[in-house]
């Protein structure tokens, strides 16, 4: 009888531990769903352009015009990327979507209060879904909402990249690393293309 009781305690402890780890890892996904949508006050919206390109700047302009208050803007690009057509604050960090989003999360975490409450990701239509999901994972635990809420259906190539990148960002939340070092060939190629 004693052995059965101990076994039950171990199973309960494992179940509780697994639940706690699962909740911790999914918390960035859950927070944006249950937290209220912040109202737009001056300076609370930030439109982020991931790597410059005329289409991405045009998307940022459309987003900015659709908001009730003029948003702040930020460009995250590779040093070899296209410079913006107009002066825009820049982060020259990140060599792929995952590392650009983690650079954004780090930058936002160190901004003085009041920080941006909503972040709008401006990128190519095919890239929007993956970029927004990754930004929600990285910024959700900070209570920052990420949009746009509606995006075009991504190509099959983009959909294939979504799950591995989402797992990278979930691991980044847990460990502080996007595990890019585990793929040295891809890492070297991306860094060379980006100029870092």
Language model region names:
Residues 9-28:
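Hydrophobic membrane-insertion alpha-helices, especially the h-region
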Residues 11, 184, 194-196:
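Extended, histidine- and acidic-residue-enriched regions that form the cofactor-binding/catalytic faces
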Residues 11-12, 60, 172:
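General helical structural elements
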Residues 41, 191-194:
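Trafficking entry modules
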Residues 1-7:
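N-terminal Lys/Arg-rich, disordered targeting/topogenic segments
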Residues 157-186:
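A transmembrane-helix-recognition feature enriched in membrane-embedded lipid enzymes
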Residues 140-142, 184-191:
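Short, surface-exposed, charged/polar-biased interaction segments
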């Amino acid at each position: 009888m004693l052995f059965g009781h101990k076994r039950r305690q171990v199973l309960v402890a494992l179940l509780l531990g697994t639940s706690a780890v699962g909740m911790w890892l999914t918390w960035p996904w859950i927070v944006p769903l249950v937290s209220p949508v912040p109202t737009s006050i001056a300076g609370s919206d930030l439109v982020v352009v991931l790597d410059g390109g005329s289409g991405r700047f045009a998307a940022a302009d459309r987003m900015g015009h659709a908001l009730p208050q003029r948003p702040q803007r930020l460009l995250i690009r590779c040093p070899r990327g296209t410079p913006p057509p107009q002066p825009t604050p820049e982060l020259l960090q990140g060599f792929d979507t995952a590392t650009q989003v983690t650079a954004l999360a780090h930058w936002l975490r160190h901004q003085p209060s009041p920080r941006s409450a909503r972040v709008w990701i401006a990128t190519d239509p095919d890239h929007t879904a993956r970029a927004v999901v990754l930004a929600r994972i990285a910024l959700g635990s900070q209570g920052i909402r990420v949009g746009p809420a509606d995006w075009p259906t991504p190509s099959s190539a983009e959909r294939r990249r979504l799950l591995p990148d989402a797992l990278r960002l979930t691991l980044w939340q847990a460990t502080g690393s996007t595990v890019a070092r585990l793929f040295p060939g891809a890492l070297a190629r991306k860094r060379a293309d980006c100029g870092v």
